[in-house]
DNA sequence: TCTGGGGTCCTAGGACCC
DNA sequence: TCTGGGGTCCTAGGACCC
């Protein structure tokens, strides 16, 4: 596969720097932004509990296994990302650190607010993750750019209620670099702009190569073997070297470092290739009936996600895993693909196939830690193949679709799991360990009532 | 005591065909 | 008897992201 600067974005380039071996650009037609919320999950907790701003607090992963977000004060106290809870429990108690369970329904709604707010400042917004957005500016004034950046940060932080940082630069990768610099920047304005040749070079010279978007631990180790330690070191390698020693993704990264845009904006998110729901059990389980209920729950959730995205699947994967960290216990990991007779997103169909798979891979006598269901080979609902089917199957499909529709409308109105399939269950052993869940301040009326009274 | 969950992209290599 | 070599398709697994 050949790497070419994106054809549309190619038009941005107007002048090429004559000096140096490579392409370094002096002027750009368009500008990219990367906005991200600082300590997003913790920040959203502070919004409705203002006293938290003066207390150390963290947000925990499911089952309170590790830290996934830290408040400013917790960061200053030395609490790190992904630290295991069991190592920290005593210290946290001593330091008075509050540990919140994660509440993704609430975070998603806050993320939507951020997206809508930021959209008013640029031509295209792309949701990159729950707490990051890419922006594209088709027109801007070079001298006024820093001031525009500060205005976006000020207005969004105030309007949404959670602090943001912004990086502005001529490619997505450089915008990521600028954003990281903004987080560390001592001037506290929350913005870094990289738009001249000199600014970009200076930034890359001080930027560790392992912090680049797309360079993980494996590449970092490989690059250090070649004495490549900074982003500038990598950018100064000849293209053929990158081609020979790395992948096409790295080649794109190399172009982007040099100001040639290769990673286009994705205004409309592409259709998903697969959808997965999986959970670790709070405590290991070997009982088949309990695992069957968990798999039914996950399969129901996959079917719901499919319907929400207007997709059908043609195959279901089930997997079952023992606790990989308990190396002294006997291990068993397995998965299986079960093909569907026809495309479907109906809960009963997906669940029955998932259970068929589970029965095939379940072995008695193991302490299982995690199970999950994945739906694969996804196609849009609009691709109908009913004409090719036997009448009986077509009829069954229609019945299942109606049933799922009824299920969705009841559950959307009265809350998740108001109506369930018989195979599902919410036994105590299957419940997540989430002792300190914050209210869904923005999405659930009963929770909203709580805060207005309290 | 416990170590998340949900994704994408790319490459290598096997199977198969001509 | 020789057994090359180009092409496609599929899958497992690695690497990376938040």
Which sequence ranges carry the predicted segments?
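Short Gly/Ser/Thr- and Asp/Glu-enriched loop/turn motifs at secondary-structure junctions
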Residues: 128-132, 169-172, 311-315, 366-370
């Amino acid at each position: 596969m050949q790497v070419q600067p994106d054809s549309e974005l190619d038009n941005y380039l107007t002048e090429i720097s004559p000096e140096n071996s490579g392409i370094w650009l002096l002027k750009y037609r368009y500008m990219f932004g990367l906005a991200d919320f600082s300590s997003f999950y913790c920040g959203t907790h502070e919004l409705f509990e203002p006293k938290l701003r003066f207390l150390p607090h963290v947000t925990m992963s499911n089952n309170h296994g590790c830290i996934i977000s830290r408040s400013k004060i917790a960061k200053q106290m030395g609490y790190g990302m992904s630290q295991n809870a069991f190592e920290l429990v005593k210290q946290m108690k001593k330091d008075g650190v509050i540990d919140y369970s994660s509440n993704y329904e609430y975070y998603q709604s806050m993320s939507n607010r951020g997206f809508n707010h930021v959209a008013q400042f640029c031509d295209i917004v792309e949701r990159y993750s729950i707490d990051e957005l890419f922006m594209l500016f088709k027109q801007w004034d070079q001298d006024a750019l820093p001031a525009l950046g500060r205005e976006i940060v000020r207005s969004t932080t105030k309007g949404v209620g959670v602090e943001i940082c912004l990086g502005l630069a001529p490619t997505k990768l450089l915008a990521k670099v600028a954003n990281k610099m903004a987080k560390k920047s001592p001037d506290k304005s929350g913005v870094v702009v990289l738009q001249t040749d000199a600014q970009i070079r200076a930034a890359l010279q001080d930027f560790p190569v392992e912090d680049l978007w797309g360079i993980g631990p494996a590449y970092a180790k490989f690059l250090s073997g070649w004495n490549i330690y900074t982003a500038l070191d990598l950018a100064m390698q000849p293209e053929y070297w990158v081609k020979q020693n790395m992948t096409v993704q790295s080649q794109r990264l190399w172009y982007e470092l040099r100001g040639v845009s290769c990673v286009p904006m994705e205004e409309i998110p592409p259709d998903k290739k697969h959808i997965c729901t999986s959970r670790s059990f709070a405590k290991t389980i070997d009982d088949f009936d309990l695992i069957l209920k968990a798999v039914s729950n996950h399969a129901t959730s996959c079917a719901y996600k499919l319907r929400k995205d207007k997709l059908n699947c043609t195959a279901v994967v089930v997997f079952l895993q023992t606790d990989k960290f308990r190396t002294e216990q006997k291990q068993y990991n397995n998965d299986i693909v079960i093909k569907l007779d026809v495309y479907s997103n109906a809960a009963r169909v997906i669940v029955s196939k998932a259970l068929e798979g589970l029965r095939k891979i379940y072995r008695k006598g193991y302490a299982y830690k995690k199970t999950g269901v994945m739906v694969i080979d996804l196609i849009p609902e609009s691709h109908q193949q009913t004409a090719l089917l036997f009448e009986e199957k077509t009829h069954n499909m229609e019945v299942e679709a109606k049933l799922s529709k009824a299920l969705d409308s009841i559950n959307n109105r009265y809350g998740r799991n108001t109506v369930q399939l018989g195979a599902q269950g919410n036994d105590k052993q299957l419940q997540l360990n989430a002792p300190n869940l914050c209210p869904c301040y923005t999405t659930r009326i009963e929770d909203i009532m709580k805060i207005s009274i309290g």
